[in-house]
Amino acid sequence: EKTPLNAVIHGMVKREGFTAQKVYFQSVPGFYVTGILFRPQDAKGKLPAILCPHGHGGRLQTHSEAKVLDEIRIGAEKFKESGRMPKVARAATLARLGNVVLLFDMIGYADNVQLSYQLAHRFAKQRPEMEDKKSWGLYSTQAELRLQSIMGLQTWNGIRALDFLAGLPDVDPKRMAVTGGSGGGTQTILLGA
């Protein structure tokens, strides 16, 4: 059941051709999704929107100078500055092209720390201490029987992120897309199913 998002958008930063703001909203009561909202500067009317789930490197993934220089050498990257943080650069570029873009955090990454990275991505054991007949936690038999998992919660977060974008006054909800690479590509496939 979809509940109110109670979204908060704050902390605007202006850059050449776009703005960026931090955002958080509730995908389920008490559980927050975090990310960065990019908008084209001085755009008018309803705009297309793109949800950008990052991969396993996280939205704050940075490449070493050697990697960036190698990518420039082979033509995979053009600019040293944008090559350092490719996920943020992709979102900024899409905004400069006229799209509203949400680069949201997977569970355990960047600002999304209600469930730790270790629990969400490195923990794979049953947790009998998290289980009784009336309540349970992730990785318990009760949760598994109800198909409650990190992947399920992350997919729901993606669905709610699309709801968030669709509800923005400057977004045309009929022109929305999802694109991501690596783990973000997996999320793209799941959201498209």
Residue spans for each PLM region:
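Short, flexible loop/turn elements at secondary-structure junctions
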Residues: 25-29, 39-41, 55-57, 108, ...
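Glycine-rich nucleophile elbow surrounding the catalytic serine of serine-hydrolase chemistry
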Residues: 180-192
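N-terminal cap/lid segment of alpha/beta-hydrolase-fold proteins
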Residues: 2-49
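Cap/lid segment of the alpha/beta-hydrolase catalytic domain
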Residues: 45-46, 52-159, 166-167
